[in-house]
Amino acid sequence: MKFLQSFPVILAVFSFAANLVSSKLVYEYETKYVTVEIVTIVSGETTYTTERLETNGPTSTTTTIVIPSSKPSSPESKPKSDSQPMFQSPSPVQITPSTTSINNAPSPTKPETTVTASPAVIAHTSVFVVTPNSAPTTSSSPPNIVQQVKAAITPSAPKPQPQPQPQENNSGTNDDSQLSSFSRQILEAHNIKRASHGVNPLTWSNELYNYANKVASSYDCSGNLRHTSGPYGENLALGYSSGANAVSAWYSEGFNFGGAGKLNHFTQVVWKSTTQLGCAYKDCRAKGWGLYIICNYQKPGNIIGQELANILPLIRS
């Protein structure tokens, strides 16, 4: 924004010329008529003021001749030059920017995250039993777990009688004499139970043993049992002092021949179509458990729809 003010001012500008003509001083006076304009400029919060000269009248010249007495006297003052306009630099103006204070701005809210745990899905293809011989010394309570694929049956097995601990190494490998002792014991225990039902005895399979031994070697003695879901029939046990005691616990589950019998550890032990056996173990007594025992069967038993042909009743006690 501009504000313009103008008023006439007579500015006398003298041009001095001193010439010596016939021992005389000649003075010439020049008069100019100008107009002074004061311009005010407002820009935002800053104001500027300037002055501008403009010539708006005729110029007159007056000549005066003076005869000096002895020495020419110097003029009292030197005339001002009229070539430069008058201009006043604007004074600096400090502008303080306005600020806005926000005191009640809401703090950002951290989004809440809800995590919903999905239930674990565990698939079992065979059955297994965990029944300890005695309460582990390092566990708060002894395990008493029975799980299987087709049915869950709580066995009423009698407490196994204390027997000498097997001397085999943890996985049942490397020492043939110890391995054969364990394999003979558990194979014999199977065949005694099978003979009571009039089915053929099982034979030992190195292929099944190697499979079972691989699983036993990797067991962590945690007290949790999980089936391998392999191509063979499978029974698991934990907490027993020998393979024979584990077989007795499996067999004690029994089968209801007069009604809707359920497939379990017993039915796999006496399954008629099964012909081969391979078992291995790991010693978990150092962690408060007994032996971890795994037995694999070929052909696998517990096949739904084949119960009548493969589960025969007891013929002798």
Swiss-Prot record:
It is found in: Secreted. The keyword Nucleus does not apply. Residues 1-23 form the signal peptide. One of its GO terms (biological process) is sexual reproduction. Its main location: secreted. Residues 58-76 have a biased composition (Low complexity). Pfam families: CAP. GO terms for cellular component: extracellular space. Disruption phenotype: reduces capacity to damage oral epithelial cells. Keywords: Glycoprotein, Secreted, Signal, Virulence. Residues 84-116, 168-179 have a biased composition (Polar residues). Glycans are attached at N169. Induction: Induced in hyphae and up-regulated during oral infection. Expression is higher in white cells. Residues 52-116, 155-179 are annotated as: Disordered. Residues 187-297 form the SCP domain. Secreted protein that acts as a virulence factor during infections. Belongs to the CRISP family. This is Probable pathogenesis-related protein CaO19.6200. It comes from Candida albicans (strain SC5314 / ATCC MYA-2876) (Yeast). The lineage of its organism: Eukaryota, Fungi, Dikarya, Ascomycota, Saccharomycotina.
